[in-house]
């Protein structure tokens, strides 16, 4: 038995010396999973989360699921396999993501959701999201003002599987529908995509040449819409977005898009990491699982202070 123990210890020491034979579990790894980074909002989330995690002494594993629930599930498996201490997740669907978050919980890994909620409570430790309804009302109020309280308009909606798309649309309509001379002539989903928004806007414009405004569920679609309008020589159409991206900031400053609504992507992601750190070190949980962060209207008056989804002093 002593010989066996000596051999076992020798093998263990040899494996450590080689640095290749032992499983690679990171004692201080935080996994950060978001949609694709070609959308600057999601990139800002990842950058903010990674910066805060490294500041607090963690290693990071950054992955993108491209709004594919199956791919997201595989990434949760990767995080589990790597022994992550926490997962920061902007999920791939309110219903489709519940099982993946539960899988992480069952493996002893807490999840901290940002931007998008899931249709379940008690599965994630935290769900930190923008106050999308409040933000949408801000955007709609500015849109109505810019439209002079009348005229035909178009609404571009996000992914149907994303609860934010519906919440923002409801917030828009709860304001706009109070103005009887504001008339919706088209409402279509462009799935948060700039390319789809460009194509949809071209088609809508052909059928409705008399439109006066476009209100968009996010900035990426707003950028697609303004590009299509400008290509058609329609610089008179009012476009309002939602997110607070640098691209839209620049468009506002140059007289293109008229307004957007800032949701604090960077700060939201950093708060999630801070809460994950408190949980990892002390098992401290936030007072509320679902937490709302208010949005801010961005227009020509304050666009110059906007940088990477945050207002500077």
From Swiss-Prot:
Its main location: periplasm. InterPro entries: Peripla_BP_I, SBP_2_dom. D-apiofuranose binds at residues 39, 115-116, 162-164, 168, 218, 243, 263. It holds the Pfam family Peripla_BP_4. GO terms for cellular component: periplasmic space. It is found in: Periplasm. Residues 1-26 form the signal peptide. Gene3D superfamilies: 3.40.50.2300. One of its GO terms (molecular function) is carbohydrate binding. The keyword Nucleotide-binding does not apply. Keywords: Periplasm, Plasmid, Signal, Sugar transport, Transport. Part of an ABC transporter complex involved in D-apiose import. Binds D-apiose, D-ribose and D-ribulose. Belongs to the bacterial solute-binding protein 2 family. This is D-apiose import binding protein. It comes from Rhizobium etli (strain ATCC 51251 / DSM 11541 / JCM 21823 / NBRC 15573 / CFN 42).
């Amino acid at each position: 038995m002593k010989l066996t123990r000596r051999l076992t210890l020798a093998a263990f020491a040899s494996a450590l010396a080689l640095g290749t034979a032992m499983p690679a579990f990171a004692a201080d790894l935080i996994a950060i999973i978001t949609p694709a980074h070609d959308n600057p909002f999601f990139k800002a989330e990842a950058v903010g989360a990674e910066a805060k995690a490294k500041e607090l002494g963690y290693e990071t594993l950054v992955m993108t699921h491209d709004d594919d629930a199956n791919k997201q599930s595989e990434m949760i498996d990767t995080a589990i396999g790597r022994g992550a201490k926490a997962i920061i997740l902007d999920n791939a669907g309110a219903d489709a993501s519940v099982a993946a978050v539960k899988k992480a919980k069952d493996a002893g890994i807490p999840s901290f959701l940002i931007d998008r909620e899931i249709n379940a409570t008690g599965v994630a430790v935290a769900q930190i999201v923008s106050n999308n309804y409040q933000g949408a009302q801000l955007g709609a109020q500015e849109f109505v003002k810019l439209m002079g309280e009348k005229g035909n308009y178009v609404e571009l909606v996000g992914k149907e599987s994303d609860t934010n798309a519906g919440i923002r649309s409801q917030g828009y309509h709860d304001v706009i529908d109070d103005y009887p001379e504001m008339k919706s002539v088209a409402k279509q989903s462009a799935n948060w995509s700039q390319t789809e928004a460009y194509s949809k806007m071209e088609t809508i414009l052909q059928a409705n040449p008399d439109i006066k405004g476009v209100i968009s569920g996010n900035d990426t679609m707003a950028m697609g819409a303004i590009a299509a309008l400008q290509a058609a020589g329609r610089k008179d159409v009012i476009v309002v977005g939602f997110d607070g991206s640098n691209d839209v900031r620049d468009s506002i400053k140059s007289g293109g898009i008229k307004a957007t609504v800032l949701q604090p992507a960077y700060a939201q992601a950093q708060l999630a990491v801070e809460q994950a750190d408190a949980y990892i070190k002390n098992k401290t949980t936030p007072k509320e699982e679902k937490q709302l962060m208010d949005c801010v209207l961005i227009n020509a008056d304050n666009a110059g202070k906007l940088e990477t989804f945050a207002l500077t002093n």
